[in-house]
Amino acid sequence: MIKTILVVCIGNICRSPMAQALLRQSLPGVSVISAGIGALSGYPADPSAVEVMAHHGIDISEHRAQQLTGSLVSRADLILVMDGAQKQEIQSRHPAKTGSVFRLGEMEQFDIADPYRKQLTAFEEALEMIQRGVDAWVPRIRALG
């Protein structure tokens, strides 16, 4: 049973907050948290991320970035990352969690590019890829629950 999902990206201000919000919306009985490997701790979500999510009726303006910690990793039943490098880094730092770390795009074999400091269209493209990943994971998570 998956009770806690940890979503990870680099700064925890763009991709992981968007994925966290979409997963929370789709899985109301599951605790979904997010963090960054090199988080801009305490920073709000990127204004462009807030904007694209608002266009989809989801408010992430209250999000504050947090650093990935061993405690967060150990609490998570499932850890979803944005790319293969993040997956490898978490697996090397936390070998006991190797079987719990997957890319959000694992099912369709894709990574989600970082839109940080790019045009709004990059955020829209990232959100589209995140949604594809969420759509692939949600039925599997529900089936385990």
Curated annotation (Swiss-Prot):
Reaction catalysed by this enzyme: O-phospho-L-tyrosyl-[protein] + H2O = L-tyrosyl-[protein] + phosphate
Xref: InterPro entries: LMW_PTPase, Ptyr_pPase, Ptyr_pPase_sf, Tyr_phospatase_low_mol_wt
GO biological process terms on file: lipopolysaccharide biosynthetic process
EC numbers, comma separated: 3.1.3.48
Involved pathway(s): Glycan metabolism; exopolysaccharide biosynthesis
Family: Belongs to the low molecular weight phosphotyrosine protein phosphatase family.
Protein name: Probable low molecular weight protein-tyrosine-phosphatase EpsP
Species of provenance: Ralstonia nicotianae (strain ATCC BAA-1114 / GMI1000) (Ralstonia solanacearum)
